[in-house]
Structures are given as C-alpha cells and as structure tokens.
Regions:
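Mature extracytoplasmic/periplasmic domains
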Residues: 255-311
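Bacterial N-terminal signal peptides
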Residues: 2-14
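Conserved N-terminal structural module of periplasmic/extracytoplasmic solute-binding proteins
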Residues: 19-77
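A bilobed periplasmic-binding-protein/Venus flytrap-type ligand-binding module shared by bacterial periplasmic
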Residues: 130-135, 175-178, 249-260, 279-280
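An extracytoplasmic/periplasmic, membrane-proximal ligand-sensing/linker region
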Residues: 183-185, 288-337
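Periplasmic-binding protein-like
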Residues: 105-109, 125, 189-194, 200-201, ...
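Extracytoplasmic ligand-binding site segments that recognize negatively charged/polar headgroups
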Residues: 22, 30-37, 60, 74-215
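A ligand-binding cleft/hinge motif common to bilobed small-molecule-binding domains
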Residues: 84-88, 212, 216-235
Length: 337
C-alpha cells in the first residue's frame, strides 16, 4: 500500500517538475491570430522543455516596441515578422548572429546573407485586392485588373487599405508601388488613390474582412487573408494586379541580449525545419524551404508570377523616411487606434 501511494505521489509530481524545468521564451510576432495556437503547439511538441509566450501585434507596433526596448530587450525571439523590420534591427545590431541547423537549405533570397546568419525566412506574403462581386454589382463598380484602375472616380469611398505605419501589409503594398513606378511616381499614384480611400486600417487583414462583409467594394490586403476568406465562401474575387504586386518575407531572429540563448537557438532550429515549413504551407504557398508542398487551397498562381523586384536591404534603410512621409500626407483618413 505504501508503495502504491509513493508511486501515485511520484506520478503527480513528475508533470509539475517537468513544467518547472521548461524554459519560457518570450516571442514577439505579427502572425495572424489563428496561427498562434498551432505554431505554439508544434514547437512545444518538438521542444519538450520550451514554453512559448507570445506577444502579438501588427507589424508596425511590434517593430516600434522592439526598437524602443533595444537597451533592455524583453523579447527572446521574433518568429513571424517582416524582413524589412528585421533588416532595420540588423542595422542597429539588435539581432543575435546564429545560423540555425539546416538553414543553408533555405532559398538564398529568403535568408540572411551574413555568416553567421542574423535572420531566416519562413515564407513570402503578397499584396492582393479583395473585390466584393455582390457590392460591385449593387454599386456599379468595375472589376479592376491593375492598380491604376483603382483611380476610377467610381471607387470614391469604396476602398479600404492598411496604414503602412501599423501594418506590414500596408508597407509591402506601398513598396510594390515604389518598385513599379519609382518613388516619385508612387507618391503621385498614392495622392490620387487617397481621394478614393474611405479609411486606412491598422491591420492587414481588416480591409479584406471589410470587403468580405460587404462594407466596402474593395479591400487592399494580402494573399493569406484573401484566400482564407474566399475558401470560407465570402463573395470576393482575389485580384492580383497585372502591373505587379509587392511582397515581403515573414522571418525569424534571435534578439541580442536574450537571457535564454540556448533555448532560443533550439527554437530557431525548429523554425527552419521541414515540420515548421509544412506548418507555414497551411497558410502560404511561397515557402523558404524548397521541396515542401504547400497545402493551402485556392491559391492563385498569379501571385508568384507577378512579384515585383525589390531590394529588401535598401528599402529597410528607407523605411522610417517613407513611413514618416506617408504619415504626413495621408494619416487624416486613418481609423482611430
């Protein structure tokens, strides 16, 4: 009887001891909310002694917070943030140099060129137009095929777009226009587009959600959200403008100054693994790890075919200046925070 009681006591204590031995990693992210639970579950299943504590917000908010905390970092890692943001932090020596195990297999244009690496890519996300076909018929809105088509006066008050200062989607959309038209041409285009914009949101998903609900005819958003809503039956067409679309990389990095460096390195190893890439492939089709078949349904092939060429490092250095100029010109139509 005494042996049974001791055994039961041990079984009760063992899970508690295991929990106490786990290293808690504070991970900053701009992943979509529905990605947080599966990412955490997969990582913690692979790394039994690691616990992930997410800090999640839009790209602009997370980036500003990380930079503000530079002298006293609170994040151990970043998992799922714009490469533009990470390159900006790299220039400020905020990222811990580390080449995750297996990272050499990633596509060369989707990982750090430094040795050791300072960041590793996960996938690419791409700007898209969510076009509500029911609203379009009701309000006599023409189906756009190019960005230029959105300047039609019939779209006045019918377009919502993410604020680039808050949203990585807003920034990559603007970057696409700059790459396509040159900076001066892009500002001229945005001046005219601004006349048709009803509101700038603080989330990259919000414009497509708005369009899917029929609140507006057009939402400028990104591939994952547009495909997900279309698959759920929303009355939207996913339009990939023929004049080219901007894109960004979701990426991962260890923050310099983390007190949990060894655990962070192990999580970084996991983020470049095939298991992680298969997880990314549930949401995106343009993956950093070759040979992994994405499982996301209904992803238009035009996304990969119409990517504009962009110099990530150059744009990262200009990010603050571009965002300040955008703020000066257009912030009057931004949604309340």
């Amino acid at each position: 009887m005494r042996f049974i009681l001791l055994a039961l006591a041990f079984l009760g204590v063992a899970p508690m001891a295991e929990a106490q031995q786990r290293t808690r990693l504070t991970v900053y992210t701009a992943l979509e909310n529905e990605q947080l639970a599966p990412f955490k579950q997969a990582a913690e299943a692979a790394l039994r002694d690691v616990e992930i504590a997410w800090v999640r917000d839009s790209t602009g908010v997370i980036t500003a917070r990380l930079i503000a905390e530079k002298a006293n970092p609170r994040a151990d890692m970043v998992w799922g943030l714009s490469v533009f943001s990470l390159l900006q932090m790299e220039a400020q020596d905020m990222l811990e140099p580390y080449t995750p195990r297996g990272a050499e297999a990633l596509r060369p244009n989707m990982r750090s060129a430094r040795s050791p690496m300072t960041w590793t890519g996960m996938d690419a996300f791409v700007s898209a137009i969510c076009f509500n076909t029911v609203v379009a018929q009701q309000r006599n809105l023409p189906r756009p095929t190019t960005w230029q088509d959105l300047l039609d006066p019939r779209f006045r008050g019918q377009i919502v777009m993410p604020n680039p200062n808050s949203s990585g989607t807003g920034f990559l959309t603007m970057v696409g226009w700059i790459a396509n038209k040159g900076e001066q041409g892009a500002w001229e285009f945005m001046n005219r587009l601004h006349e048709n914009i009803q509101q700038y949101t603080h989330s990259g998903s919000a414009p497509c959600n708005n369009a899917a609900r029929g609140e507006f005819g057009v939402g400028l958003s990104f591939d994952m959200r547009s495909v997900a809503l279309k698959n759920q039956g929303a009355p939207i067409d996913i339009i990939v403008p023929t004049d080219g679309v901007g894109f960004d990389l979701e990426a991962t990095a260890i923050m310099r100054g983390t007190r949990n460096l060894e655990a962070a390195k192990r999580l970084a190893d996991f983020t470049v693994s095939r298991t992680a890439a298969e997880l990314y492939g549930r949401y995106y089709a343009l993956l950093a790890l070759p040979g992994v078949e994405p499982t996301v349904r209904g992803y238009p092939a035009e996304f990969a075919q119409r990517l504009v060429s962009a110099n990530f490092a150059e744009i990262a250095l200009a990010r603050d200046r571009l965002l300040a100029e955008w703020q000066r010109r257009y912030d009057g139509k931004s949604a309340p925070r």
